[in-house]
Amino acid sequence: MAAQDPQNQKRRDHNVWSLPQRKASRRLPRKENSWDEFRRVIPLVPLHPRPALDVAPPKVAVLMCTMQGQRFLAEQLNSIATQTHPNWEIWASDDGSDDHTHSILEYYQEHWGEDRMSIHAGPAEGSTANFLSLTCRADINTEFFAYADQDDIWEADKLERAVKWLQTVPRHIPALYGSRTQLVDERNQYIGYSPLFTRSPSFGNALVQNVAGGNTMVFNRAARDLLRRAGDQVQVVAHDWWAYQVISGCGGRVHYDAYPTVRYRQHDDNQVGANISLGARLVRLRLLLKGRFRKWTDQNIQALMSIKPLLTDENRSVLDEFAASRNGSMLQRVWGLWDSGLYRQTVVGNVALVLGALLRKI
């Protein structure tokens, strides 16, 4: 059951998301079991027939990267199977799992068919490289593309909402959809929500912050073609942040949906968590002071410089001014942020941004 649409609500705090209590998910075993034992507890959801071609909505390629994902993969696959937008196909890229991840993918492929699920070997160079490699595959030919992690749960209308907005954008314009997320624990029990962002997405925001998690992102073919031109060998911090930077920087359109379309599972094996607690924020502050964010910015700027001809004239100027000001005096560093129009989505985030500039940590 999807979350209640916040567009019909008047309040904008965390209490706006009034959801019914969800039944706890049945986790698949964490310890190693034989495949026969493991398969017996997989709650596979059968598919509805694919729509007839003369009435079929546009096809979405679901780009899913996996690595040691046996605990939650089946639940994620089932949530894709129950989408109200029925025309999708999964391209799964496994980075060398030695648990039952690959067997689970093959099990679903056997029941759903190869036209719904194709399985490929990833580059085994980490999650970011795996997603970039999958994004740049020339043999994926659909109108829309959606990133998918291996351990989340999609709300039933996730693809429908994304495609509805993407279809308002002319096909030749790169377009990226992302949304807020609901946070759940290992058993799919409510924890909270990701921060609600209210400022418009832009390249000035993308240079210093990612506006939406990759697990919510859906984009059109023009955006995918742009990411392919950037290539899969760029050294970037994260594939989703990179997508936001490239698409906004090259004049594309980016839409942030305040409605949470994904239940973002928080667990010990997460490579990246939501980081909304006070403790997590203190950790981020410590990383900022230790120079981690500056290293990330170095990496992203270097990658953006490699595609500089693709950026709009205005955004090339923004990139140049930001890159130059980072190595200037204290006044130049702060002025560079202001003059180039860089911002984060929250007051606290902007305070941290200015602090980082003052301390030469951005």
Predicted feature residues:
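Nucleotide-sugar donor-binding/catalytic module of glycosyltransferases
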Residues: 38-278, 358-361
